[in-house]
A protein has these predicted regions:
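Non-catalytic terminal/accessory segments
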Residues: 1-461
Length: 461
């Protein structure tokens, strides 16, 4: 190793991991005082990937990503806020462990969250903050190398690709006459990935034995649940930055098989839809691909959730499609029900918190929901949902006001005539019925809710 290379390695081991934007501001003088880096030392081949993982720019990007993703602590209790200070003190040792192949990840912390469709729970494995940082640094390097080689039909967890693009591609297949879908559901995919099979796929792309050992260590790190650590014999736990990339690598073999057979398909992570022209063709594809997945990939197809059907009868990434000559994207019924259920949960809180707090929570949820489901082509549904949210709020505020005296006073204060306010306040009708009344439409108008920050799901409806 020459003198210049020695200087670069010394600089790498002394990286300044001070938190950006915190007590210390990085100004011109401070930047100039950082160790001179020179040009990045790029590995000549896949035998030296760990050197690229430990490059300064890659590490800074990894730190920024881990911080922006936030997330809870792992088994060691270290939080995101603690990470920069920890790295500042311990980075030289950590770097040496990574480059010598002796870094040992800690077990992941088991967390269970309800599935959106109410069908049980999804098990997550939360790595420690430090392990997330290392995984992120590894993932960035491998993603740059692997992603260009992945199938054009794969859309999940890939830079520059999205669920919206996947749904639009599915729509194009339907418009082109492929009116039947083979909807494949992989049973507990992330929990059942075969480690030996996966490591073989990685070894076909990576020669750096240190990296192979590190990835194997992450896979075998174990799971801590209720204070006890269980060994990990299969699966890539959801919750770590590396898991989505590894899942794409596993299923790239499925993509290539479908391409080899000439199928029209779309895959987003473990959601795969294959589009064919007839039900009979779909049944043949289902049988043969299930055999391939079971015997070649060592995975299991969930037969109860998989089906050959019309696209209008299935959902894909929260959307479905209309029948008829003009195929439109629509929001799947379960997604609509989940939206309403969440709105009910938020508006029930009006009784115990201020309307401002409720509005902030509603606005945050509705903007996020609109950002994704606004991709539908049925604006009338979005308009109806916005009106429904306002009705929920009117009913909730009516309950909050409780007594006829207060209800009358609140309505008058909001511009309702005394006579109409008195008649409405004395009504024996329930809150949901009165939410549609003229008095509440005037006193709690659309403009009033807009002034409180309530967004619309479509335009200014």
């Amino acid at each position: 190793m020459n003198l210049e290379s020695d200087k670069r390695q010394s600089a790498q081991s002394e990286l300044d991991f001070s938190p950006r934007g915190e007590a210390r501001k990085v100004g011109r003088q401070e930047v100039e005082s950082l160790p001179a880096m020179g040009e990045p030392e790029s590995p000549a081949n896949t035998c030296r990937i760990m050197e690229e993982v430990c490059e300064r720019d890659n590490l800074r990007e990894a730190l920024q990503r881990v911080k922006s993703n936030k997330g809870s602590a792992g088994v060691d209790g270290m939080t995101i806020d603690d990470l920069s200070a920890y790295l500042k003190e311990h980075w030289p040792v950590i770097r040496e462990q990574l480059l010598s192949g002796t870094y040992e990840p800690k077990p992941v912390r088991r967390v269970e969250i309800p599935k959106p469709d109410g069908g049980g729970v999804r098990k997550l494995g939360i790595p420690t903050v430090l392990d997330r940082f290392v995984q992120q640094a590894v993932m960035q390097v491998l993603q740059r190398q692997w992603d260009p080689t992945f199938s054009q039909h794969s859309y999940g967890f890939r830079p520059g690709r999205s669920a919206h693009q996947a749904v639009a591609q599915a729509q194009q297949y339907i418009v082109a006459g492929y009116g039947w879908v083979v909807d494949l559901d992989l049973e507990k995919f992330f929990d059942r990935v075969n480690h030996d099979k996966l490591m073989g796929q990685i070894a076909n792309r990576v020669e750096d034995k240190r990296l192979l050992k590190l990835i194997r260590a992450f896979l075998n790190a174990g799971v801590m649940e209720n204070g006890l650590v269980s060994p990990s014999v299969e699966g890539t736990p959801q919750g770590g930055p590396l898991s989505p990339l590894l899942s794409n690598l596993v299923l790239d073999e499925l993509d290539r098989e479908l391409e080899r057979r000439g199928h029209r398909f779309v895959r987003y992570a473990d959601d795969s839809n294959i589009y064919v022209r007839s039900e009979r063709a779909g049944q043949r594809v289902m049988e043969s691909i299930t055999h391939f997945i079971t015997h070649k990939l060592k995975l299991k197809v969930n037969e109860s959730k998989s089906a050959v059907a019309r696209p209008q009868e299935r959902k894909f990434l929260g959307f479905s499609f209309t029948a008829g000559p003009e195929v439109k994207r629509v929001i799947a019924p379960k997604a609509l029900e989940r939206f309403k259920q969440r709105i009910r949960e938020i508006t029930r809180k009006v009784k115990g918190v201020s309307i401002k707090t409720t509005m902030e929570e509603l606005a945050s949820y509705m903007r996020g929901w609109r950002g994704y489901f606004g991709f539908c082509e049925t604006p009338e549904v979005l308009i109806a949902l916005t009106r429904w949210v306002r009705l929920r709020l009117r009913a909730a505020l009516w309950r909050q006001w409780k007594t006829p005296r207060r209800r009358r006073a609140e309505l008058i204060a909001r511009g309702v005539t005394e006579r109409l306010a008195s008649n409405t306040a004395g009504s024996g009708r329930g809150p949901w019925h009165l939410a549609r009344s003229k008095a509440l439409s005037v006193g709690l108008s659309n403009a009033y809710f807009r002034s409180l920050g309530l967004p619309s799901l479509f335009g200014t409806c």
